[in-house]
A protein has these predicted regions:
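Pyridoxal 5′-phosphate
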Residues: 1-283
């Protein structure tokens, strides 16, 4: 979503700088520092990458932006981070923050944009002036109510939920790394990795084939982001950017999880399916 808008702005004559990432999906603050200019007006950095789970240094980046480019507003796509981290936008120096309801068990199609009161935004939709003039059109009251309830609920027992997610992630990585010819992608350090996402490459098996084989057994995983699911792209742009080996680009799946029983069921099926699928892939 952010990338397409940046490409659009580039077409309109704006100068846009795209920062590289390392092999775990993280940006370098030094690269950001070098890219900032006095006339920079907007910086957007993903809080958590939705494919490999890299948690970007958002607070440090925001501090750099406000210090070195005082005219710039700082935006973060927090769709994979909201509910998983305690985000305080003003304290973190975040001017704009995007959230999507379905990631916190809210109604699909709902979401919100946090806007610092200092930021003045022109509406894209004109009309009746609903939502304080920011988005005209009849309010989706059930969606708003559901999103509000989900937002209130997702931070209840936060520490306990975090501990559970971290334990599940660590357990899954420990077990999946016992399988032959696999590679776990993204940061290894807990503080740099989201607790709910694990990216795994399975050498010798196409991701689409493994995805459907798991699907037939009631296990639902992803081979890319929802943002790119409607685009006929040969491989994920994210996986290319982290310089994944060419033979792994089309052999990578993203896992999220709920409980240990589901993980055990998934791991059992991976152990059973991988040798069979690799055998057929060689023929």
């Amino acid at each position: 979503a952010v990338l397409q808008h940046m490409l659009y702005l580039q077409e309109q004559g704006f100068e846009v700088t795209f920062l590289p990432v390392d092999e775990t999906g993280l940006i370098s603050l030094e690269d950001l520092k070098e890219a900032l200019r006095e006339d920079t007006i907007l910086v957007s950095i993903m809080y958590v990458n939705n494919e490999v789970g890299a948690r970007e240094p958002v607070e440090e980046a925001a501090e750099l932006v406000h210090r070195l480019a005082p005219k710039a507003w700082f935006h973060t796509d927090a769709i994979q981070a909201y509910g998983k981290y305690q985000i305080r936008p003003k304290k973190a120096g975040i001017d704009l923050l995007s959230v999507s309801g379905h990631k916190i068990h809210g109604p699909k199609g709902s979401g919100f944009l946090y806007i610092n009161e200092k930021v003045k935004i022109h509406p894209l939709i004109l009309g009746g002036g609903q939502q304080k003039g920011m988005r005209s059109g009849t309010d989706n009251v059930p969606g708003i109510a559901g999103l509000g309830a989900a937002a209130a609920d997702c931070y209840k027992d936060f520490e306990e939920k975090q501990k559970k997610l971290r334990a599940l992630r660590n357990y899954f990585i420990e077990e999946v790394e016992k399988l032959p010819d696999i590679q776990v992608n993204g940061p290894k350090e807990e503080e740099k990795a989201a607790p709910q996402i694990v990216s795994v490459s399975f050498r010798g098996v196409r991701s689409e084939v493994l995805l459907h084989a798991l699907e037939e057994r009631g296990i639902y995983v992803s081979s890319g982001s929802a943002c790119s699911s409607n685009k006929k792209l040969p491989v994920s742009a994210v996986l290319k950017e982290i310089h994944l080996e060419s033979d792994l680009l089309d052999s990578t799946l993203r896992f999220s999880f709920c409980n240990e029983e589901e993980l055990d069921y998934c791991l059992e099926n991976l152990k059973e399916l991988l040798p069979v699928l690799r055998k057929y892939a060689r023929h």
